């Protein structure tokens, strides 16, 4: 069963039921998640201690093979990192990407309150890390300079992905 992600993040009482933040100081899984995020372009030039502090606010979810993570049209609430497993991203039944450990997706939701543009399904047992927009906004309030750097990194990532999509469309015309 897949719960509505939008409900989980807009109602704090519901968030406690459906989402758990399992990280604690010194947790080795937190260190792994921190390193995986640091290996992405989103956290380029963000100091490790600040990345780790932000990662400590993130949420873990386990999915079974075949379980829907989100569907096209669902309200986006944040980006998702594949900690372990595999995720298929598709739109109109066409595969857009097959993601593995360390890959991230759904980052549009960090920048805009838009609906998901694709479907995401676990193709194997998967552990995912949710980086919610509301957590990013709180972090930016406390760390505005680093927040500006992060938003520049996010903008560059979105621009690169848009460019790649445009190139793919141009080849098909």
Give residue ranges: language-model regions.
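Cytosolic regulatory regions built on CNB/CRP/Popeye-like sensor folds
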Residues: 1-173
């Amino acid at each position: 069963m897949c719960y509505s992600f939008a409900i989980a993040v807009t109602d704090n009482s519901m968030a406690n039921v459906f989402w758990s933040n399992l990280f604690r100081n010194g947790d080795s899984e937190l260190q792994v998640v921190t390193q995986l995020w640091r290996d992405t372009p989103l956290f380029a030039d963000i100091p490790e201690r600040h990345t780790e502090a932000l990662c400590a606010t993130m949420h873990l979810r386990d999915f079974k093979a075949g379980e829907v993570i989100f569907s096209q049209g669902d309200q986006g609430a944040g980006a998702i990192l594949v900690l372990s497993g595999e995720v298929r991203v598709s739109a109109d039944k066409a595969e857009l990407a097959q993601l593995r450990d360390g890959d991230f997706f759904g980052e549009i939701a960090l920048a805009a309150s838009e609906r998901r543009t694709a479907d995401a399904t676990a193709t194997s047992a998967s552990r995912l890390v949710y980086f919610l927009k509301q957590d990013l906004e709180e972090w930016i309030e406390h760390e505005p300079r680093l927040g500006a750097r992060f938003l520049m990194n996010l903008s560059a990532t979105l621009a690169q992905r848009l460019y790649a999509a445009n190139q793919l469309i141009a080849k098909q015309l």
